[in-house]
């Protein structure tokens, strides 16, 4: 009898394991394991961010690396409940041993009900493996659907005739992770709507299940000697959500959990709803500001055992290029244009036609210097300056015409034009023109300054067009 039981158990185990394995092969790509997290070299991440899509749009690992030198990954999912964040934490620790976990608390607030849908469990499970995937799918009310997702061979068995031997190779090695979980959202309207958080007015009772799972997350972090930081990125909060957020922070204090409320930094960040954020999701402009504040907080409050990794650096380089492109695209504020250009690697071309009426003062001079053009533009404002910098280092300049070759591309800059490989660049007729290229010369963005206009013309804009 015992032998029969053992044989039956072994056969059931083999059948279940084989079914789970083949389920991945039978699933179409859109339903298969989506996470690129497993492709990140093991034990290289310094911090992992968990939570809802607010962090996917609101925190940029490229900016954090620029400001701190640390590696981070946004292992979040749409409207991720706290109990799912616990499963995601367990999943994250399978391949990484970070010093810090950052947890978004949006789904502890009442507005989470707006985005709640059973599909959120399926979305989160796509970023998980093993028991964490199963545990998350079993949170579905429809258990039949949960089992179909777990054993998706049941749902997609009709695809058997489309499979080949390559379909059975279940691997994450080739999944690119160069977004690091960040979603690059462009501003859609050039609007500046400044907000202040309301004062706490009413007592709000948080969901007990959320509190229990938050304590489980803290316990798991403590068990692995990992620090835990709760965050809330900026979003348009009503009174009820604000009271709930204050209740979360009160609970955090009571349980010795660190937190950072970015909604308290709106004025310091000059954070504007419209250009920096939609109602809930922050744009790449807003994510930059959030990530700067987070970086400053990390350096002041935590210690990290960072080790450089060539593969991670290579993938971060791609994210930095796409980040810079997004920050400069449609950018009409020269101060931000120059600041962002100075923060990332790239090729910067300057065409400055000297004139005694230029409005260059110390702030503007500093920005030009930070882009690699070490020159006194204040005391030499009458003198022409045509130059090129590469990754923040001056390649060279001249006051009549400057020529150079970078990565096989010829650059000529003079009073009238900027020429790249024999072609005159369009839209470079400003009295001061700055052009930013990525290192591959794949894209470029221009900024023209007319000395007769203000350097900062935010209030003189109609949509994206400025006078």
What kind of feature is each model-predicted range?
Residues 100-110, 171-268:
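Conserved, well-ordered alpha-helix/loop/beta-strand core segments that scaffold catalytic motifs
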Residues 118-224, 306-325:
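Secreted/periplasmic serine-hydrolase-like ester/acetyl group-modifying domain
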Residues 3-24:
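Hydrophobic membrane-insertion alpha-helices, especially the h-region
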Residues 325-467:
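Short acidic-hydrophobic catalytic motif
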Residues 25-44:
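Alpha-helical transmembrane signal-anchor/signal-peptide segments
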Residues 50, 54-139:
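Membrane-embedded segments
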Residues 242-313:
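C-terminal regions of proteins
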Residues 47-51, 282:
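Short hydrophobic beta-strand that contains or immediately precedes a catalytic carboxylate
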């Amino acid at each position: 009898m015992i032998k029969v039981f053992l044989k039956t158990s072994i056969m059931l185990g083999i059948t279940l394991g084989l079914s789970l394995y083949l389920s991945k092969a039978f699933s179409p790509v859109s339903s298969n394991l989506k996470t690129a997290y497993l492709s990140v070299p093991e034990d290289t991440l310094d911090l992992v961010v968990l939570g809802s899509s607010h962090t996917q749009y609101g925190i940029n690992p490229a900016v954090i690396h620029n400001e701190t030198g640390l590696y981070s990954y946004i292992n979040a999912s749409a409207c991720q409940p706290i109990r799912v964040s616990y499963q995601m934490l367990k999943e994250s620790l399978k391949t990484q041993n970070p010093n810090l976990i950052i947890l978004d608390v949006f789904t502890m607030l009442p507005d989470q009900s707006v985005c709640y849908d059973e599909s959120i469990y399926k979305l989160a499970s796509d970023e998980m493996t093993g028991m964490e995937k199963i545990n998350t799918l079993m949170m579905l009310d429809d258990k039949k659907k949960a089992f179909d997702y777990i054993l998706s061979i049941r749902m997609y068995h009709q695809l058997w005739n489309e499979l080949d031997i390559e379909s059975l190779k279940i691997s994450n090695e080739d999944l690119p992770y160069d977004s690091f979980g960040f979603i690059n959202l462009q501003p859609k309207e050039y609007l500046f709507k400044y907000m202040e958080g309301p004062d706490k007015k009413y007592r709000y009772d948080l969901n007990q299940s959320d509190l229990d799972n938050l304590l489980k997350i803290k316990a798991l972090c403590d068990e692995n000697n990992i620090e835990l930081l709760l965050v809330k990125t900026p979003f348009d909060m009503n009174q009820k959500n604000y009271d709930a957020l204050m209740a979360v922070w009160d609970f955090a204090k009571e349980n010795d959990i660190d937190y950072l409320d970015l909604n308290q930094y709106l004025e310091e960040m000059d954070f504007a709803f419209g250009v920096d954020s939609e109602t809930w999701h922050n744009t790449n402009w807003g994510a930059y500001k959030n990530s700067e504040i987070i970086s400053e907080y990390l350096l002041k409050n935590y210690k990290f055992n960072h080790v450089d990794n060539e593969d991670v650096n290579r993938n971060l380089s791609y994210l930095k290029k796409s980040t810079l492109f997004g920050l400069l695209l449609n950018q009409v504020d020269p101060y931000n244009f120059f600041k962002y250009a100075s923060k990332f690697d790239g090729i910067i071309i300057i065409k400055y036609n000297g004139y005694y009426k230029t409005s260059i003062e110390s702030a503007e001079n500093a920005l030009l210097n930070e882009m690699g053009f070490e020159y006194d533009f204040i005391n030499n404002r009458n003198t022409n300056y045509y130059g090129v910098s590469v990754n923040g280092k001056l390649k060279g300049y001249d006051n009549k015409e400057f020529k150079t070759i970078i990565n096989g591309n010829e650059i000529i800059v003079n009073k009238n034009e900027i020429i790249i490989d024999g072609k005159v660049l369009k839209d470079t007729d400003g009295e001061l023109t700055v052009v930013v290229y990525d290192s591959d010369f794949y894209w470029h963005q221009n900024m023209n300054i007319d000395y007769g206009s203000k350097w900062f013309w935010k209030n003189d804009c109609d949509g994206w067009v400025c006078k």
